[in-house]
């Protein structure tokens, strides 16, 4: 039997929890190491399954990769030595196991002028096509087609261009950005993603010698350079993990201090928790959430940064399920994310969906049941729901959670949560 979590509800979460590096940042930073011959070092890397998977992808492209412990628990140092001529075929099994593997496309085009990248796997949260990635590469002078389950791209040379994205896609912004840093001339990306992870990537690329302006705005301007050099870079704190702990504190009427993250990256999320009745305080490297009473109902609508993150939608539904009043949650990014609601209904949630909307009428307490994770964030949301359910909830397919939450069980236990990992050895 595969591993599962046993979550017994009833305890408040109280204490302090440290957040490691951002999953949505570290994998792209690792891919960016392909852009420079030599050894790049990335610190504050989270201990999640996708990091060794990305290491396997890079090894398949000719890099030497080592992962060493940096601090007790959940942080590592990743060292990547990139050869003078990386391989350009990324069509082996590791590539298909997680979505972020596609971010090697841009660096391979920049260094090799050709790339064969297997279509990636990852979370089952709806359609995430590569159309914008391919369109951006074509504007830079490449051809790009889907052939035999792979993205196949080629170029004699890459030239700067003005590229307007139909939607501020994080992945498309990253791939076009990494291709453009070594292209000839100026590239302008209009309607670029503004996420902190994009800013983190831009900061690392600038340290490597790239010329980029506009990071954190909707217009990125890149002046191509002839070559980049290796660097050392520290990954930003994971705002999604940090917000998960904040929402968990609110759901359990707890008191949790979260460190290792820039609270400015979570301004809207923390405002929503304040609207739900939480007391929020800040310091230099984190925030504290104190929820004195049952949370009040709050409406949520997911949007690209600086809007409410789609990755936190399952946790928002979990909060709404036990809040006082009725909440509406609108999903504007990934249409299939509401399949999580079916599992919440197993736990007794009064919820219904209609297209991009979910209406949740809060009840004082959920009831335990066996539930199944469909993706990283849904899994975390189900664990949080189990913390406010009567009895013991079994959360299955927890390998999803391990892809995004380092030492999740241990950190919950440190805050007083009654959570146990079982199975896997039968």
Swiss-Prot record:
Binding residues for UDP-N-acetyl-alpha-D-glucosamine: 99, 311, 333
Keyword Cell cycle included in the entry's annotation: yes
Lineage: superkingdom: Bacteria
Gene Ontology MF term list: UDP-N-acetylglucosamine 1-carboxyvinyltransferase activity
GO biological process: cell division; cell wall organization; peptidoglycan biosynthetic process; regulation of cell shape; UDP-N-acetylgalactosamine biosynthetic process
Active site, per annotation: 123
Intracellular or extracellular location(s): Cytoplasm
Gene Ontology cellular component list: cytoplasm
Keyword Cell wall biogenesis/degradation: yes
Residues where phosphoenolpyruvate binds: 23-24
InterPro entries assigned to the protein according to its UniProt record, in alphabetical order: Enolpyruvate_Tfrase_dom, Enolpyruvate_Tfrase_sf, MurA_subfamily, RNA3'P_cycl/enolpyr_Trfase_a/b, UDP_GlcNAc_COvinyl_MurA
E.C. number: 2.5.1.7
Main location: cytoplasm
Pathway(s) the chain acts in: Cell wall biogenesis; peptidoglycan biosynthesis
Catalytic activity: phosphoenolpyruvate + UDP-N-acetyl-alpha-D-glucosamine = UDP-N-acetyl-3-O-(1-carboxyvinyl)-alpha-D-glucosamine + phosphate
Entry keywords, A to Z: Cell cycle, Cell division, Cell shape, Cell wall biogenesis/degradation, Cytoplasm, Peptidoglycan synthesis, Transferase
Family note: Belongs to the EPSP synthase family. MurA subfamily.
NCBIfam families per UniProt: murA, PRK09369.1
Job description of the protein: Cell wall formation. Adds enolpyruvyl to UDP-N-acetylglucosamine.
Protein's recorded name: UDP-N-acetylglucosamine 1-carboxyvinyltransferase
Species annotation: Nocardia farcinica (strain IFM 10152)
UniProt lineage: Bacteria, Bacillati, Actinomycetota, Actinomycetes, Mycobacteriales
């Amino acid at each position: 039997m595969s591993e599962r979590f046993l979550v017994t509800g009833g305890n408040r979460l109280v204490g302090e929890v440290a957040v490691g590096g951002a999953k949505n940042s570290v994998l792209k930073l690792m891919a960016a190491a392909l852009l420079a011959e030599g050894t790049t070092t990335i610190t504050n890397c989270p201990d999640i399954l996708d990091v060794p998977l990305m290491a396997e992808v890079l090894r398949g492209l000719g890099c030497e990769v080592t992962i060493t412990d940096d601090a007790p628990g959940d942080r590592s140092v990743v060292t990547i030595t990139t050869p003078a001529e990386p391989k350009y075929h990324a069509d082996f099994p590791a590539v298909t196991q997680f979505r972020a593997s596609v971010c090697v496309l841009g660096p391979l085009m920049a260094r090799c002028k050709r790339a064969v990248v297997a279509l990636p796997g990852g979370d089952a949260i709806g359609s995430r096509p590569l159309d914008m990635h391919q369109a951006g590469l074509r504007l830079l002078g490449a051809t790009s087609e889907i052939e035999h389950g792979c993205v196949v791209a080629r170029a004699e040379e890459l030239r700067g261009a003005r590229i307007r994205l139909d939607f501020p896609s994080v992945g498309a912004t990253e791939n076009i950005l990494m291709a453009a840093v070594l292209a000839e001339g100026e590239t302008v990306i209009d309607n670029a993603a503004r996420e902190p992870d994009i800013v983190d990537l831009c900061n690392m690329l600038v340290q490597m010698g790239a010329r980029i302006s506009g990071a954190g705005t909707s217009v990125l301007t890149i002046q191509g350079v002839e070559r980049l050099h290796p660097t050392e870079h520290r990954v930003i704190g994971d705002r999604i993990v940090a917000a998960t702990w904040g929402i968990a504190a609110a759901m359990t009427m707890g008191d949790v201090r979260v460190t290792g993250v820039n609270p400015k990256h979570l301004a809207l999320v923390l405002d929503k928790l304040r609207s739900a009745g939480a007391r929020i305080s800040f310091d230099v490297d984190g925030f504290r959430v104190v929820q004195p009473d049952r949370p009040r109902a709050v409406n949520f609508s997911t949007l690209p940064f600086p809007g409410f993150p789609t990755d936190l939608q399952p946790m928002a539904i979990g909060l709404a399920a036990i809040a006082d009043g009725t909440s509406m949650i609108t999903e504007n990014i990934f249409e299939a994310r509401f399949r999580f609601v079916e599992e919440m209904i197993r736990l007794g949630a009064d919820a219904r969906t209609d297209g991009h909307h979910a209406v949740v009428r809060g009840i004082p307490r959920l009831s335990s049941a066996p539930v199944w994770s469909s993706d990283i964030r849904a899994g975390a949301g189900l664990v949080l729901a189990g913390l406010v359910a009567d009895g013991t909830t079994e959360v299955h397919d927890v390998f999803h959670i391990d892809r995004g939450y380092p030492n999740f069980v241990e950190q919950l236990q440190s805050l007083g949560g009654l959570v146990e990992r079982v199975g896997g050895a039968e």
